[in-house]
A protein has these predicted regions:
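Conserved PLP-anchoring active-site segment centered on the Schiff-base-forming lysine
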Residues: 1-14
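Conserved core segment of the aminotransferase class I/II
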Residues: 112-182
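Short beta-strand->loop structural element characteristic of the AMP-binding/adenylate-forming
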Residues: 26-33
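Short, intrinsically disordered, charge-balanced linker/junction segments flanking boundaries
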Residues: 3, 186-192
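Hydrophobic alpha-helical segments in the ANL/AMP-binding
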Residues: 15-22
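Helix C-cap/helix->beta junction micro-motif
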Residues: 23, 83-84, 114
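Active-site phosphate-binding strand-loop segment of PLP-dependent enzymes
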Residues: 37-99
Length: 192
């Protein structure tokens, strides 16, 4: 709703922030530390603002900082959202592309209360610019998100959706991700 508050990381992905603003939402920004969103600042924002609708976070390789939220902070984020009755929008376009270190469980994997909306993208793992994404959320939320998306661009290109469907139907996704990680690992090693 117009005037509702979305809590986001500072800095954050400008594309998402502009989308939220286009619906008349107010943004309350929380600093990003080395291990993710500042949880003390987040709780302060949640205490002081009663019309927060959701918390937007990019916990893996946060855009633009590149930082990854620690497991402890992910647990705290989930508990704060539960305590204050707000949703979490976990945007994870880069999570499958970790080339070193241990994977950190998603916030969605902790969700026993149906408060985490999980978003992923095929643009980072299949083809840049394909612009096909997905969400995992309760049906009423998916229905509202569908209406919002239709207002932005009518729908994702049908041809691109068909390409993704065919690719997912005929490809070993995990093997493909392994190859992509190897390519990125080699490029990272060359640059470092």
């Amino acid at each position: 709703n117009f005037g509702d508050i979305i809590v986001c990381e500072n800095p954050s992905f400008i594309g998402s922030l502009n989308c939220f603003r286009s619906y008349g939402c107010k943004l309350k920004c929380v600093p990003v530390e080395e291990d993710g969103m500042d949880m003390n600042a987040l709780e302060k924002v949640l205490k002081e603002n009663k019309n927060v609708r959701f918390i937007y976070t990019i916990p893996n390789f946060q855009n633009p900082s590149g930082r990854t939220m620690s497991l402890e902070k992910r647990k705290t984020l989930y508990e704060l959202a539960k305590k204050y009755g707000v949703l979490i929008l976990e945007d994870n376009p880069y999570g499958d592309l970790r080339v070193s270190g241990e994977n950190v469980p998603t916030v969605k994997s902790m969700d026993e209360d149906g408060i985490v909306i999980y978003a992923g993208s095929f643009s980072k793992v299949l083809a840049p610019g394909i612009r096909v994404a997905y969400v995992i959320a309760p049906e009423p939320i998916v229905a509202k998100m569908t209406v919002c998306k239709q207002g932005q661009d009518v729908h994702t290109a049908m041809f691109n959706q068909m390409l993704v469907y065919e690719w997912m139907s005929t490809t070993d996704f995990e093997a493909h991700i392994g190859k992509i990680r190897d390519i990125y690992r080699r490029k990272m090693t060359l640059m470092c």
